[in-house]
């Protein structure tokens, strides 16, 4: 990615009414200038003229029962593949078979990452969301000694216009894990414990070959 240009395209379909809301089909595609696009992801964006109140939420005390002993710098050096700008996990508060709790930094402004951004501020915070998926990778590594990549999300709902600038606490509640798949939900809250957003029905694929792709030095162990 550092030496080759990659073209990313965003597509939006026709507006459709669904009850009291409107929906738009969206796609993220990548490819070359030849027009041979690859569809990376699809979703339905639900449009509304108002925010809905955040639901009440309190995670189980069992979620914070297990300590996480690895150093964050070591985590990024030894397990995760993310570069410096995406290293947003500040502290992993706890990790157990039930899930993980972590403090996550907010992303810098769009102009720090995009040469000509469409907005001056983020709506959904890209660094926070990516770090949530990083948490899932680390949790899978603790439980199954292998890593994962996201494959599906049922829904994402945000309860305010933007994420707090001072970061959030993210709770990953794992609902299922096998040798090949994990499922769970994410809850994002501010420093006062108020819910900022929820991501429901997260699914990831586990595969030992991914660790070799993340960290080439592990290829010798194949």
Regions of interest found by a model, annotated:
Residues 1-222:
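Acyl-thioester-processing domains in fatty-acid/polyketide/NRPS systems
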């Amino acid at each position: 990615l550092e030496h080759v240009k990659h073209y990313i395209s965003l597509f939006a379909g026709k507006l459709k009414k669904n009850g009291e809301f409107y929906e738009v089909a969206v796609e993220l595609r990548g490819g070359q200038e030849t027009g041979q696009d690859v569809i990376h992801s699809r979703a339905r964006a639900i449009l509304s003229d108002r925010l809905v109140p955040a639901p009440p939420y309190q995670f189980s005390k069992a979620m914070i029962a297990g300590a996480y002993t690895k150093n964050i710098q070591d985590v990024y050096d030894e397990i995760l593949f993310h570069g410096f700008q995406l290293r947003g996990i500040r502290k992993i508060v706890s990790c157990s078979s039930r899930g993980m709790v972590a403090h996550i930094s907010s992303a810098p402004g769009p102009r720090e990452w995009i040469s000509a951004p469409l907005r001056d501020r983020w709506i959904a915070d890209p660094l926070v969301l990516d770090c949530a998926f990083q948490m899932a990778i680390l949790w899978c590594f603790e439980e199954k000694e292998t890593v994962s990549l996201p494959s599906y999300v049922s829904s994402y709902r945000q309860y305010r216009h933007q994420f707090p600038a001072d970061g959030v606490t993210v709770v990953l509640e794992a609902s299922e894990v096998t040798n090949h798949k994990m499922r769970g939900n994410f809850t994002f809250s501010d420093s006062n414990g108020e819910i900022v957003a929820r991501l429901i029905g997260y699914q990831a694929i586990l595969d030992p070959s991914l660790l070799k792709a993340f960290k080439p030095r592990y290829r010798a162990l194949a």
